[in-house]
Amino acid sequence: MRGGQGAARAPVIQFTNCRILRGGALLREDLWVRGGRILDPEKLFFEERRVADEQRDCGGCILAPGFIDVQINGGFGVDFSQASEDVGSGVALVARRILSHGVTSFCPTLVTSPLEVYHKVLPQIPVKSGGPHGAGVLGVHLEGPFISREKRGAHPEAHLRSFEADAFQDVLATYGGLDNVRIVTLAPELGHSQEVIRALTALGICVSLGHSVADLGTAEEAVQSGATFITHLFNAMLPFHHRDPGIVGLLTSDRLPAGRHIFYGMIADGIHTNPAALRIAHRAHPKGLVLVTDAVPALGLGNGRHTLGQQEVEVDGLTAYVAGTNTLSGSIAPMDTCVRHFLQATGCSVESALEAASLHPAQLLGLEKRKGTLDFGADADFVVLDDSLHVRATYISGELVWQVEEARP
């Protein structure tokens, strides 16, 4: 029903009594939807001479583009890095459960794993449109194994790899193919990394720099080769130093290709990044900040021991550690919690907080005409929020896919 006459015959839904996020501002306007897309009401009125078939009162709520999570390792007991005969059912469970947190699209993320895990899991996670069944899958994020041993974090050292002489063929042999892959995180200081970055970006795959001890010069060279993202800024990289700020220095570098800027992921869970560091990053480069959850399989579960790939993770309160260590191992905060914490910690505008979880990840992936926006013609993926940014409802392609249960009298 999205194209041609089919879309034109679809019912027109008018969402009223709302504030919609468009063009960086919250506007008191109605949102018009038909055939799964955002509709221009002027064309409806003056060219088609039609009105809405249905009106829905939003009770003064905010309508924002659906959240996009480009780094999520699992959740609700599901570990994307665990090979099984039915990986798809686990992905589907997470896709369904994250709807309640306003996420309409995501990149299932695999941490460093044995080769057989990549070969078994990757073919089972195809790109998939969202709907009542769950959030859409935009492609897999492969975080490792081509990362620094020194900054491996929760990644198992035994399965880390360096690039062989025929580097891109080594990548293909490691992953077993790249058909379902959208993002690859690697350490740019590894030998042959620049040729790998060029080869991946030529295929339309986003290259992210992370788990790395790279200096600024090496990071800048990686961006010149095509890298566009930084994996969880500040975490698992050299700390900022005034004589060589390392990867962090990319936020204000003057050696990036003309017309391009770097995007960077931030885990705003109140654990991974001090509020002062959040403020420094946001004030230095607000348009590049991408909120990510980096959620682990323990998301939505209680205290105790859980898995993350080949490692055991221990959850204590709001923090997840590699079992028996003090090394952080992902987050257990969902995306809407990260948005609220980011807003509170940085003092930024509501609009900026919402765009960090929607527009910016869409721009990173080159999807800003379809996702992360409520502009005319975009996919009608949006989240309904109250003034405190708690999710009231989630829509995908204009269809209600999740709604909060109202308190009973």
Swiss-Prot record:
Active site residues according to the UniProt entry: D294 (proton donor/acceptor)
Free-text cofactor note: Binds 1 divalent metal cation per subunit.
InterPro entries: Amidohydro-rel, GlcNAc_6-P_deAcase, Metal-dep_hydrolase_composite, Metal_Hydrolase
EC number: 3.5.1.25
Metabolic or biological pathway, per its Swiss-Prot or TrEMBL entry: Amino-sugar metabolism; N-acetylneuraminate degradation
Pfam families, per database record: Amidohydro_1 (PF01979)
Name of the protein in its database record: N-acetylglucosamine-6-phosphate deacetylase
